[in-house]
């Protein structure tokens, strides 16, 4: 009897947990199950048309998917549209209009997997497919993606070609929009990582906009609907990346596709993926795109967005441009000409492409000096109380890379040597961002000045505890093993 009661209790408890899980908001359930939908063949931002095309070909034979070749880019790369569903409401999404803005393209591949697989979301999928017809144009600018650049092969910003339509990629988008007379449009982009969400220390990791359709920035019914749906997105994002949502300036741009598609009668939403801490390949933001797009499809299919007050959209802070740095060193005692100046140093890191734009390494430089109390950074260091000196160059010229193995990098750094002159020439991506600066025989020490990448020593009680090398700050006590491993892997030290 006791066994029967126990089993009955377990069944009821399990059913209760299942019901509780199914009653959780859609975005929470999607987040918990995201890894099963994430397309494993794409893990970094610099994928090409040749990487994406097999995934589009793969869904051609899948039930419920329709694939149509829309045309070709200037250099002859195919541009396709993938359609899902048969509902009366048409939704058009286009990504990578700018070739170096790939985050949403990754998310679209994940969305394809969501609809392809049998999973716990069959009811949601069925409703979306019954009420909506989704049309995806992934990688509208494949020639730009090949070079990992914003513009197309003609050097044109496609988002300024909505009126003249001089480029085939722009013509394709306009023709599709007109032929569908789409009810909704999602304009999917990336933005720079130095935007903040308002005057705050938080990155604008996702920025949104219901673009204006005229210079007066009037709000008609369609634009209001777009604002309401953005309110739904905002609530989802606040649950996952709180305070990291920004709003784009809504000044009317007469040449832009988003503004014009809004004007042509499609409820248009701009989504921009910015920066997020410790997410250089934007995999967190890829997931956020996945969540807010599927939540949007669900909301449109139910009509629930109509209950969202406009004040939610209006409460989203505007982007603060140029507000962030990668690293800010605060209250640095900068020595110069026998005097000491207390200054903040704002350092940014820039990607330098190589291997046909499929890889990159980082170069850093000081981008601002002075009182940076109104700026913020992904990483900050309070240098107050530290004595600051310029890093020294190791006095001996090393002829061959293999000779570096005889040097102890930690001992060098503790003695103030941040640079080694090497006669043998190494590829720049090998030496970039290392805890030691590897330079040529005749290189000069970089000063603390705008546009330069100085090496600095931070001392307390005569002991060097931190070093700044190649734009990165290193703690010699806590990160000794990381430093050793990095130099061993790259240089054999």
Region locations from a protein language model:
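C-terminal accessory segments enriched in acidic
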Residues: 19-46, 180, 209-219, 223-493
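Surface-exposed patches in mature extracellular/periplasmic domains of secreted proteins
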Residues: 67-71, 120-125, 244-250
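Short beta-strand/turn micro-motifs at beta-sheet edges
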Residues: 76, 145, 257-260
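Bacterial Sec-dependent N-terminal signal peptides
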Residues: 1-23
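Short glycine- and acidic-rich boundary segments immediately preceding or forming the N-terminal edge
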Residues: 21-78
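Acidic/His- and Gly-rich active-site-bordering loop/insert found
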Residues: 74-97
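Active-site/substrate-binding loop(s) of hydrolase catalytic cores
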Residues: 88-90, 97, 102-243, 262
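Well-ordered alpha-helical segments embedded in enzymatic catalytic cores
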Residues: 51, 55, 169-172, 229, ...
């Amino acid at each position: 009897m006791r066994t029967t009661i126990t089993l009955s209790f377990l069944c009821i408890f399990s059913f209760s947990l299942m019901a509780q899980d199914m009653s959780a908001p859609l975005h929470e359930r999607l987040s918990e199950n995201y890894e099963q939908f994430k397309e494993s063949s794409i893990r970094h931002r610099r994928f090409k048309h040749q990487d994406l095309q097999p995934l589009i070909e793969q869904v051609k034979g899948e039930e419920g998917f329709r694939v149509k070749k829309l045309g070709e880019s200037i250099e002859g790369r195919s541009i396709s549209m993938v359609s899902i569903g048969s509902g009366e409401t048409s939704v058009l999404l286009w990504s990578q209009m700018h070739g170096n803005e790939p985050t949403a393209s990754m998310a679209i591949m994940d969305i394809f997997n969501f609809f392809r697989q049998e999973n716990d979301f069959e009811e949601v999928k069925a409703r979306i497919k019954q009420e909506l017809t989704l049309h995806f144009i992934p990688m509208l600018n494949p020639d730009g993606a090949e070079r990992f650049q914003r513009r197309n092969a003609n050097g044109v910003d496609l988002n300024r070609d909505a009126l003249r339509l001089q480029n085939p990629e722009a013509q394709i988008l306009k023709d599709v929009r007109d032929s569908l007379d789409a009810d909704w449009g999602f304009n999917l982009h990336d933005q720079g990582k130095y935007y903040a969400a308002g005057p705050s220390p938080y990155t604008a990791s996702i920025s949104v906009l219901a673009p204006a359709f005229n210079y007066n920035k009037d709000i008609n019914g369609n634009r209001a609907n777009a604002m309401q749906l953005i309110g739904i997105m905002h609530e989802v994002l606040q649950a996952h990346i709180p305070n990291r949502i920004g709003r784009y300036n809504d000044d009317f741009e007469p040449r832009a596709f988003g503004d014009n598609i809004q004007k042509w009668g499609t409820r248009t939403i701009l989504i921009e993926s910015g920066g997020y801490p410790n997410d250089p390949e934007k995999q967190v933001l890829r997931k956020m795109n996945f969540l807010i797009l599927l939540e949007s499809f669900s909301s449109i299919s139910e009509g629930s967005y109509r209950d969202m007050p406009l004040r939610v959209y209006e409460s989203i802070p505007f982007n603060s441009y140029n507000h962030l740095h990668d690293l800010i060193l605060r209250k640095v005692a900068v020595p110069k000409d026998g005097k000491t100046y207390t200054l903040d140093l704002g350092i940014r890191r820039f990607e330098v492409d190589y291997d046909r734009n499929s890889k990159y390494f980082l170069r850093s430089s000081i981008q601002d000096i002075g009182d940076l109390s109104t700026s913020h950074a992904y990483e900050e260091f309070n240098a107050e109380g530290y004595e600051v000196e310029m890093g020294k160059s190791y006095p001996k010229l090393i002829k061959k890379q293999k000779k570096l193995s005889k040097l102890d990098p930690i001992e060098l750094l503790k003695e103030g040597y941040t640079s080694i002159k090497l006669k043998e020439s190494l590829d720049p991506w090998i030496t970039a961002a290392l805890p030691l600066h590897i330079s040529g025989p005749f290189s000069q020490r970089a000063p603390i000045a705008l546009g330069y990448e100085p090496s600095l020593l931070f001392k307390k009680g005569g002991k060097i505890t931190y070093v700044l090398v190649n734009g990165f700050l290193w703690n010699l006590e806590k990160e000794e093993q990381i430093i050793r491993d990095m130099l061993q892997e790259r240089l054999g030290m």
